[in-house]
UniProtKB/Swiss-Prot annotation:
InterPro entries per record: NA-bd_OB-fold (IPR012340), RNase_II/R (IPR001900), RNase_II/R_CS (IPR022966), RNase_II/RNase_R (IPR004476), RNase_R (IPR011805), RNR_Ribonuclease (IPR050180), S1_domain (IPR003029)
Enzymatic reactions: Exonucleolytic cleavage in the 3'- to 5'-direction to yield nucleoside 5'-phosphates
Record's protein name: Ribonuclease R
Gene Ontology MF term list: exoribonuclease II activity; RNA binding
Organism: Mycoplasmopsis pulmonis (strain UAB CTIP)
Disulphide bonds in the chain: none
Function of the protein: 3'-5' exoribonuclease that releases 5'-nucleoside monophosphates and is involved in maturation of structured RNAs.
UniProt xrefs under Pfam families: RNB, S1
Length: 725
């Protein structure tokens, strides 16, 4: 009957049940069979039902194969090899789960022009995806519960002989799926729900972040001396009598940069001394291979996952005070206008005289504390030089956005007890200015010498992003002329005019940042738009960034030692592209991990704010709602379904969400109430303060409906409800 019905329906035309029966000449006695046929066709996605209850045959566009990516329990996407993505409704999963390879048919939506959807027809490959969940034990039976919402409608079956306890968080792999039942095999224990860090453990497991170093790396690092040995003093500039200092955060343990500043009659000498990691980490050693695999350190609220073993990162490579340390140094001679007169790169040895913190130096600049007179003089000279460098960069087109960020404060047990907005002081800006000049100087020298190198590059913003930035500013009543933006200086001049005529808040600064392209590593130099630098590399943090370590190696082997230069050039030319790609990739991964974990700990703190009113600013508008930012720089979501009482639509450019009566625009300040927190996902849900009471009524009705449905389902399972045919 299904084939008969389908043959006699015209595409994109709506038919009532009676019309279909009449067209197909179906006797009323067979209405139940027709109903079954129609519902089967609905399940297959071959027909759809409109709001009037009528049936519409849909156009088949093509057959596809791809990877099934489930977003939540209600929908998914199929991603194909040509990077196309097709929407799949829950009714059309047909047994597929996340990461399965599937075959599907793509249909044209009869409701929205140019909209398509897919229906899974066949599972091509069970890729045995991994799932993380927790164990509950009832009447001696172990039950596995997945954290991911997309799996909450499934029933799991796990081996009862596995060695796990109540609340253990475990990793399993899917063995098979039969009728919404997933059979899984135990892989390992990840954490426990009793830990304040279990959500963090889950993020690290999902990202396959390895904390511990392999045995061969630890064995190799154990052979490295924990002090500078006698032969290492040879052929180095001895700077141990100089007033060289470090300035870092309160919690910093890996000190990879130190400074010395001297003011002379007609110039400044800025000496930047960087930990000589390349002296200890040889190319292609076990430590080096692991460092490249990690490519960066990851900084979490409660710990650091280092790029190098602790013996190096916090030990022999760290420029700790009062001990001799090997350094890669650059002396930069700078005139009083901020121009670099000359530079000198060399290998040195230092003995840091002071381990200062940003807070200490800021207190000194604010006349809150006194220091050693010689140190005070150098710090004052340093501040003078920093301001000169800052003005120089400003003239070149650098925009110092000073975007406010928040830091999670944990107690001894690891629970979030506060969120602090970080304010940058003079000392933080000073170190940044000095490091930028050092990075520019090294990049310029490598380029001038025509040597293979690794650059930190940042392309010009696209015309599309500049146009969107202009539109965004106009919604805020700010004029900005896109066609004139042809260089960092042009962008900077336009932004300065905005600052002179309007009050610039954190949101506008974030919009500037969003307008920019992402900075990456490359063996090809195109300059750095954001820093207004023609040449820029990362030289100053080899303990925590692999590109810096690689750059040190290039300098040692091609600038300091010119033997076999042709062979060295060929060698590095072959590997630098891969090193750049790996470093860029791992940086993105690290930023994502840091953001996820910070969001989790922030959400944990916001549990105590449920039901409270907060001031917020709209920072992003998407098809499903709008993100807002609170005064402590934490984000929350107002889902479009929680914009109550009116029918809201999002503008195509994402600058506005509006109904017939109300408009909300990017940058607008609003009052909201926190209504829900998901610590596992690091999400905070809010509603407009004016909608709060209506939201509570809606939520109560929904919970009552769920409870009633659960009771009915239970009774149905127990045979207490008899449905008439």
């Amino acid at each position: 009957m299904k084939n008969l019905v389908l043959q006699n329906l015209k595409s994109n035309k709506a038919y009532s049940f009676l019309e279909i029966a009449r067209i197909n000449k179906i006797n009323p006695n067979f209405n139940s069979q027709l109903s079954k046929a129609l519902f089967s066709l609905l399940d297959q996605g071959l027909i759809v039902k409109n709001n009037d209850g009528n049936f519409i045959k849909v156009n088949e566009i093509k057959k596809i194969q791809g990877i099934f990516k489930q977003s939540n329990r209600n929908f998914a996407f199929i991603e194909t090899a040509d990077e196309q993505s097709y929407f799949v409704a829950k009714a059309h999963f047909n047994g597929a789960i996340n990461s399965f390879e599937v075959e599907a048919i793509v249909y044209e939506s009869p409701f929205e022009k140019d909209k398509k959807y897919a229906v899974v027809k066949k599972i091509l490959k069970n890729t045995h995806p991994e799932i993380i969940g927790f164990i509950k034990i009832s009447n001696g039976i172990k039950y596995f519960n997945a954290f991911e919402e997309s799996f909450r409608s499934y029933k799991f079956f796990v081996d009862q002989n596995i060695d796990v306890e109540e609340d253990d968080v475990i990793l399993v792999v899917v063995e098979k799926i039969v009728d919404q039942k997933i059979y899984v095999n135990f892989v390992k224990k990840v954490s426990t729900l009793k830990s304040n860090f279990y959500q963090i453990d889950i993020v690290l497991e999902k990202s396959k972040t390895i904390i511990d170093f392999p045995e061969d790396v630890l064995d190799e690092s154990a052979l490295i001396e924990d002090h500078v040995i006698e032969k290492d003093y040879q052929n180095r500039k001895d700077l141990r009598d100089k007033l060289i200092i470090t300035i870092d955060g309160e919690d910093t343990k890996d000190f990879d940069d130190a400074i010395y500043v001297e003011k002379n009659k007609d110039h400044f000498l800025l000496s930047v001394h960087i930990a000589d990691v390349a002296h200890y980490v040889k190319e292609n050693s076990a430590i080096d291979k692991e460092a490249l695999r990690r490519a960066t350190s990851i900084y979490l609220p409660h710990m650091v996952i280092p790029m190098l073993p602790e013996k190096l990162s916090n030990g022999i490579c760290s420029l700790n005070p009062g001990v001799d340390r090997l350094v890669m140094s650059i002396d930069i001679f700078i005139d009083f206008q901020g121009n670099t007169i000359k530079t000198e790169l060399y290998e040195g040895i230092i003995n840091s005289k002071h381990r200062l913190t940003y807070n200490q130096v800021n207190d000194f600049y604010n006349n809150k504390i006194k220091l050693d007179p010689n140190l005070e003089k150098m710090l004052n000279d340093s501040l003078e030089l920093s301001k000169i460098l800052e003005n120089y960069k400003k003239d070149e087109g650098y925009i110092n956005l000073e975007i406010e960020e928040s830091k999670v404060i944990l107690d001894k047990e690891g629970k979030t007890v506060g969120i602090k907005v970080i304010q940058r002081g003079l000392s933080e800006v000073l170190i940044e200015n000095f490091m930028v000049r050092a990075n520019e100087a090294v990049a310029w020298k490598m380029n001038k010498l025509k040597l293979p190198s690794i650059y930190r590059v940042h392309d010009n913003p696209s015309i599309e992003s500049l146009v969107l930035f202009e539109k965004t500013l106009k919604t805020l009543g700010i004029d900005f002329d896109t066609p004139k933006i042809t260089s960092p200086k042009a962008f900077s001049d336009s932004f300065e005019k905005i600052k002179q005529n309007y009050q610039i808040d954190n949101f506008v600064k974030l919009m500037v940042l969003r307008t920019m392209e992402k900075a990456i590593y490359s063996d090809k130099n195109i300059g750095h738009f954001g820093l207004a630098s023609s040449y820029y590399s990362h030289f100053t943090s080899p303990i925590r960034r692999y590109p810096d370590l690689q750059l040190h190696r290039l300098i040692k082997q091609m600038v300091f030692d010119k033997s076999n230069l042709k062979e060295k050039k060929n060698h590095f030319s072959l590997i630098l592209s891969d090193v750049s790609v790996q470093s860029s990739k791992k940086e993105v991964e690290a930023v994502s991990i840091e953001r996820q974990i910070n969001d989790i700990k922030k959400a944990e703190y916001y549990e105590s704010k449920i039901g409270k009113s907060l001031k917020a600013q709209i920072v992003s508008i998407l098809s499903f709602g709008m993100f807002v930012e609170f005064e402590d720089k934490v984000s929350g979501l107002i889902h479009i379904s929680n914009l109550l009482g009116e029918d809201f639509q999002v503008s195509e450019d994402g600058l506005l969400i509006s109904s017939n009566k109300t408009k909300y625009k990017l940058g607008q300040e609003i009052d909201v109430v926190v209504v829900k927190v998901d610590k596992n996902l690091g999400k905070v849900d809010v509603v407009l303060e004016k909608d709060y009471q209506e939201y509570l009524k809606k939520e109560q009705a929904f919970q009552a409906f769920k409870k009633n449905k659960f009771t009915q389902d239970k009774e149905k399972q127990n045979g207490k409800i008899n449905y008439k045919k």
